[in-house]
């Protein structure tokens, strides 16, 4: 049997595949689904992926499955663990947090101001997949983000860094996170370029690029990447993109994603005049919250 697209979701507890047919017709079909336990502990996520495909074949009473394209998302091996470091919580740190959550990140720590020894100890303990540094409006305060970058660089980590702060600091960041640092640097537009202005979408896209570049930490994922068409993005980020598409069709909407390990709530809405009058800080059009350890594992 051959389908147009097979979509794989390699979750923290369960791997699910969904098969779609007739996508170029007026009546596209969601044809079948299969699932199996995610196999990180077995040392290769492809075991769980093949198990999910085998489950689909059993349900549809077919011997094998072929497909023109394969797409994939992942939250295996803990998903996209991030730490976020800004200048003021209600401004740059909050903007960076919204960008990270919207991209599908799981934020394990947020700091404001200059990093202290206890902050550095937490970062080392968390061992994040990605570090996001922000701070300062464009052409405003510079020193805090530079100080924090230097402290993180001196930790000797090999964790990629996204810088989304004052654009005047970008050349400094290149000097701090040079080749000798062993840390890949991603530069992006400021998430908080001026007072009461959020600019989170460019940062979200770069975070997802960084995730895809470094997804091979889940055993076997490097082989899955060779199988798929296009990037592998964090599962929560994929749900956010779907929520945005749903918004284009029906308007303001909320999506609740009950996973095996976490429950995510996504919302896409334009502020009403009544809400705008009582807001004390800007909110992004698309936003996500996440509650860890509140999933439903079946």
Regions found by a protein language model. Name each.
Residues 16, 141-142, 172, 264-266, ...:
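Short helix/loop capping segments that flank catalytic or ligand/cofactor-binding pockets
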Residues 1-7, 23-28, 33-252:
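Nucleotide/phosphate-binding catalytic cleft detector across ATP-hydrolyzing
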Residues 6-16, 75, 257-263:
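Asp-based phosphoryl-transfer active-site loop
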Residues 19-23, 86, 267-269:
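Residue-level signal for short segments within beta-strands and strand-turn junctions
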Residues 27-28, 34-38, 244, 249-298:
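Glycine-rich phosphate-binding loop of actin/hexokinase-like ATP-binding domains
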């Amino acid at each position: 049997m051959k389908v147009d697209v097979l979509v794989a979701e390699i979750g923290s507890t369960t791997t699910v595949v969904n098969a779609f047919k007739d996508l170029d017709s007026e009546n596209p079909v969601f044809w079948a689904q299969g699932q199996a336990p995610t196999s990180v502990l077995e040392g290769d996520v492809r075991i769980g992926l093949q198990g999910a495909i085998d489950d689909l074949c059993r349900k549809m009473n077919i011997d094998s499955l072929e497909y023109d394209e394969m797409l994939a998302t992942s939250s295996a091996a803990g998903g996209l663990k991030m730490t976020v470091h800004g200048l003021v919580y209600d401004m740059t740190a909050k903007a960076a947090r919204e960008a990270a959550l919207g991209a599908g990140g799981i934020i394990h720590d947020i700091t404001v101001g200059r990093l202290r020894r206890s902050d550095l100890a937490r970062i080392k303990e968390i061992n994040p997949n990605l570090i996001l540094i922000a701070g300062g409006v464009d052409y405003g305060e510079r020193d805090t983000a530079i100080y924090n970058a230097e402290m993180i660089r001196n930790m000797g980590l090999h964790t990629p860094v996204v810088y989304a702060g004052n654009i005047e600091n970008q050349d400094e960041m290149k000097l701090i996170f040079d080749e000798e640092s062993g840390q890949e640097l991603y530069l992006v537009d400021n998430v908080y370029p001026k007072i009461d202005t959020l600019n989170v979408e460019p940062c979200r896209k770069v975070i997802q690029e960084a995730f895809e570049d470094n997804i091979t930490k889940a055993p076997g994922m490097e082989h899955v990447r060779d199988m798929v068409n296009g990037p592998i993005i964090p599962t929560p980020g994929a749900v956010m993109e779907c929520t945005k598409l749903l918004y284009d069709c029906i308007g303001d909407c909320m999506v609740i994603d009950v996973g095996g390990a976490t429950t995510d709530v996504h919302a896409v809405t334009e502020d009403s005049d009544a809400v705008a009058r009582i807001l004390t800080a800007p909110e992004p059009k698309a936003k996500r919250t996440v509650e860890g350890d509140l999933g439903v594992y079946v």
